[in-house]
Amino acid sequence: MITLYGFGKHFNVMDASPFVVKVDLFMRMANIPYQAKQGTKYLRIAPKGKLPFIDDSGKLVADSEAIVSYLTKQYQVTLDAKLTLEQKAQAYLITKSLDEGLYWCLVYSRWVLDESWPLAQKAFFGKLPAPLRWFIPSVIRRKVKKNIHSQGVGRHSPDEILAMADKSLQSLSTLLADKDFFFGEQHTSFDAAVYSHLCEFISVRFDCGFENVFTKQAKTYQNLVQFCQRIEDQFYQEK
């Protein structure tokens, strides 16, 4: 059986990483049996030092895009069989845009935004023993801030970053329109890729009921909210 390695459930979504969610949902859509192992400890054995990765009877595959490609070929997945070459090209480019743009807005909203950081800190580091819990979060937060700045998103003001995220959300809302899924009535791997990012904004729940400005903005797009609910009703009834 395939083992999927991820970070684990946080904020009411099945994983804090959209890339883990993408692989998880893809396998659910494709009816591929798997088991999940979760925790940052698995970063030590990750082939590329990141999560997710899968172990398929001893074969390790890392990176969500590579994993989906491998599973599609290895298990003859036909989710995208009815898509045209043009639709597949559109899906690829939009997915890349989300991975390189909206993702970093998500990271900013959790790790840099002061109103969100205390809740993210508690979720990610709350189980650390007291000595480590006092300094590890701030060390990692500084590293994440440096990465966001190097990537480029972190060089912008909070309002500019929110506007960047909103542009992606607005574009997705326009593309989805009144359809059930992005390419019609049948879900595809592209829906898994889009949901993996959207759920991290729209489906998140904090115990205190807090919502940051990014989540509030995402929820203004009712068709995207309904899309996430549609996916969850079909594939995540255990939520």
Predicted ranges, named:
Residues M1-W134:
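GST-like domain detector, emphasizing the conserved glutathione-binding G-site
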Residues W104-V225:
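GST-like fold's C-terminal all-alpha helical module
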